[in-house]
Amino acid sequence: MPVRFKKDIQYYKFCLYGFLKNQRFFDPFLMLFFLEKNLSYTQIGLLYSVKMLTRTILEIPTGVIADALGRRGTMIFSYSSYVVSFIVYYFSGNYFFLIVASFAFGVGDAFRTGTHKAMIFEYLKYKSWEDQKVHYYGHTRSWSQVGSAVSSLIAAVIVFYSGRYTDIFLFTLIPYLIGLALLASYPKILEGSGVKKPEQSVTDVFKKVLHEIFSSFKNLKSLKIITSLSSFSGYYMAIKDYLQPVLQTFATALPVLLFLDNKKREALIIGAVYFIIYFLTSRASKYSGRSAEKFSSLLKPLNLILVMGLVTGILAGLFYKFNIIIVSVILFIGIYIFENIRRPMAVAYASETFSDRILASVLSIESQAQSLIAALFALLLGFFADIVSIEFSFIITSLVLLVTTPLYMLKNK
């Protein structure tokens, strides 16, 4: 199917949103930030789980709020929660404040996920470009990955000159405050058809949205679809930051930039690798639509990438175990690429399967499932990393998810 949407002002706003959203300068160094504070992997896993479980608990009600009372306000509240989180991370002096910051970050995620995707699809519906979902979402998502690539270089410079991981949270405030202003400029048509009208009471609006949600999820098939779509993304969210200690080991062993101290050398090498990762994932996301068109239906590539990604996780652990670190790093990069090819397909598949009227809620439920899976596997990864080793934590968690795939693989309608 040829690309036929117009790159208008709103298209560029969506792209700019994705770019600014991923100016998370802490992303390439978050786990190293925690390790520098002498936390165990189990404690780190708990922080990730707090963030994910907060997102899980709040996911469905925030989706309902977005569908029923307005998506722009929901997004603005989300960004405000992120700002609070960054400030607390910056000033955190003990584990309790790290938990508070993780909670605030989880609140921000809960109010954001699903909502912005629904705004994009609302715009496609308004423009009669509904058949362009994979292409359009893939294009806008690719700008998120470009943002991450630029962010990784800026983060490396910040750590290089400051010598402190903490400062990256302070600098992250700048793009997020700009993002707040951008969201406020979105047109009202993106609020969705479920927004409360003057003649309707708030109770009536919520009842209507909730009724449609329960109607969509009253059978096991719908739940199976959500589990299948969210499984690999949840796994990815839990395992992706473990690339950082792997890269730290790689940077220490690499005989380059030896005139610099370890932290400066690690900052430059990790920043450069993450730049390459996000450049590749931006291409993967952008061409997700073309990849999907090679198959007769979306469920085939969704199932295939799920299995390939989990096998890649097992192999990454095995190569790290045998100290072939460069291959382990390359395989980790493969997991990032698989996620960014699969994610636009998953979102498009959900939008084709469920009613447009409750799309924000459906996507929030799917994102909630991601968060629950990520919370569980973050704890498992941390636990096994402490009692056995990091490499075996990769192997065990990937294997657990792989052997259970027959339970939730997508089937023909």
Label each region the model flagged:
Residues 7-11, 90-102, 318-332:
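Helix-loop junctions at membrane interfaces in 12-TM secondary transporters
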Residues 299-342:
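C-terminal transmembrane helical hairpin of 12-TM major facilitator-type secondary transporters
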